[in-house]
Swiss-Prot record:
Disulfide cysteine pairs (residue numbers): 80-125, 174-185
InterPro entries with a match to the protein in the record: Kunitz_inhibitor_STI-like_sf, Prot_inh_Kunz-lg
Annotated source species: Solanum tuberosum
SMART domains hit by this protein: STI
CDD domains, per database record: beta-trefoil_STI_CPI-like
Protein name, as recorded: Aspartic protease inhibitor 8
Length: 220
């Protein structure tokens, strides 16, 4: 009997020693929480505000520069200007102010939002201030950015702002539902980069596979 008790104690000893190591001073390391989203900053280093207006300006200078503006699309029968363009140079007119409308809260990197030209307009043209991506253009073999979108709807009006590794930001088009036709939509989020194509001598914003538009945001 004494021999059995002795053997039982020997069996329990490692368990007691092992459990004693788990004290309040020696806790198991659990996976850390996801990092907080980073706010998008303007040219002055301030966080973008949904209630403020900004110009989208190119990082490049000269012919590589130019602000984003609202203009009339070639051959369009829309009653209001309905194209999203970039001026051909940073020497010239200022761009059309925009505001960024997040799903909720502030404006953060890699978060869905709507973009709207923030200008006075008649009631007929209100929807023609909201950015969206149009249908596949057969000539350019891509989709052009235009206005006529909606706010807060699961359609072609959602974008993201992503930080470049060194300086500035890119715009991404990110439809809520998988697009039927989107030649440059990639990865699990079906996002596509926004760049420019030349349309009738003007630089039109469009979805691109390479050379996206590198931009900054200047508060108005």
């Amino acid at each position: 009997m004494m021999k059995c008790l002795f053997l039982l104690c020997l069996c329990l000893l490692p368990i007691v020693v092992f459990s004693s190591t788990f004290t309040s001073q020696n806790l198991i390391d659990l996976p850390s929480e996801s990092p907080l989203p980073k706010p998008v900053l303007d040219t002055n280093g301030k966080e973008l505000n949904p209630d403020s207006s900004y110009r989208i300006i190119s990082i490049g200078r000269g012919a590589l520069g130019g602000d984003v503006y609202l203009g009339k699309s070639p051959n369009s029968d829309a009653p209001c200007p309905d194209g999203v363009f970039r001026y051909n140079s940073d020497v010239g007119p200022s761009g059309t102010p925009v505001r960024f409308i997040p799903l909720s809260g502030g404006i953060f990197e890699d978060q869905l939002l709507n973009i709207q030209f923030n200008i006075p307009t008649v009631k007929l043209c209100v929807s023609y201030t909201i950015w969206k991506v149009g249908n596949l253009n057969a000539y350019f073999r891509t989709m052009l950015l235009e206005t006529g979108g909606t706010i807060g709807q699961a359609d072609s009006s959602y974008f993201k702002i992503v930080k470049l590794s060194n300086f500035g930001y890119n715009l991404l088009y990110c439809p809520i539902t998988p697009p039927f036709l989107c030649p440059f939509c990639r990865d699990d989020n079906f996002c596509a980069k926004v760049g420019v194509v030349i349309q009738n001598g003007k630089r039109r914003l469009a979805l691109v596979n390479e050379n996206p538009l590198d931009v900054l945001f200047q508060e108005v």
